[in-house]
Amino acid sequence: MSLLTPLGLFLLLTVLTHAQAPSPFPWPEGEKLTYLIEWGPIDAAEATFTARPEPKRDGIERFELFLRSRGPIEAFFPIRTRITSLTQLHPWRTTEYIQDRNEGGNIRHRRTLPDYSVRLGRFFPAPGRTEENFDILEGPYEDFGSMLYHVRAYPWKKGSAVTWQVIENKEPLFAKISCSQVARLEIDDRPPLPLIEIFGQPHGPSSRHPGWMKIWMTDDARRIPIFAQLKFQYGTFDIRLIRGGGPELDYRPDGEPIPIYSETESSPKP
C-alpha cells in the first residue's frame, strides 16, 4: 500500500450529509502548507499542499499535494509524487483527479473523471492505455487531493459527523469524518491553543482498509491543520506543520525552521 493512500485520510478520510462549505473559504489564493511526516524516530517524508483557482474555469479550484521522501526512506525508496484535484466549490465535488506517482522507481500517471450526469467514472490507468469505466453512486465525490480542504471548510461542531464518498482510481470509497472536540487543547508539546479535533476512518465497505486519522486544526478563520496522527498497516505516523502557518504555528524543535528539501530541487515534478 502506498503511503499516499492512507495519507488521503489527511489530505482526509452516498454523501449522507450534503456538505455546504462556508464562504469565504479559509485558505487564501496560492496558500502553501508543508508538513513533516515522521515514522517513529524517522523523518519519512514531507508533504506540501497548495491551493489556487484553476485558470479559465470559473468555480474550479486546483488543489495539489506534492509528496517527497526524506531521510532513510529517500535512500531505499525515493518518492516524488504529485496529486492534483480539480474541485468544483459550489456544490463541492471533484471533477478530475490526477496522479503523477514516482515511488521507488515505479512511475505511474493516472486520471479519474467522474461524470455525475450519468453516474459513470472514467479511469485512465496510463498514457496509451484503454479507458476503463465504472459505476459511481449518486451524489458528489471527494478525492485524496481535496479532502483536507473540505475538512477545513466544513462548519464543524462538537459531535457532528459526515460520511463522504471518496474516489481513488476506479474504486469508490467511503470515509466517516467526525468532530471530537472544539476547545483549548494542548497537543504536540505546544501551549494550549483553540483547536478543532477531527477523527476520520474508512466506513462501510471501505472498512477492509484498516486505519484511522486524527487532525488538529486551528479554531479560527484560517482553519490550519497543525498536527495529525495516522494509523495504518505499517504503523503510526506523526504529521507536523513545518512551513506556512507562521512562527506561532510552524513546528520548530530547535527554534529554527526545518529545511524543506523539495524547495532545493531543480525539477520537483515527477
Please provide the spans of the model-predicted regions:
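Bacterial N-terminal signal peptides
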Residues: 5-15
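N-terminal secretory signal peptides that target proteins for export/translocation
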Residues: 1-2
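Hydrophobic alpha-helical segments and their boundary regions
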Residues: 6-8, 30, 144, 212
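Intrinsically disordered, low-complexity regions
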Residues: 13, 39, 131-134
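Hydrophobic, well-structured mid-protein blocks that either form specific transmembrane helices
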Residues: 108-151
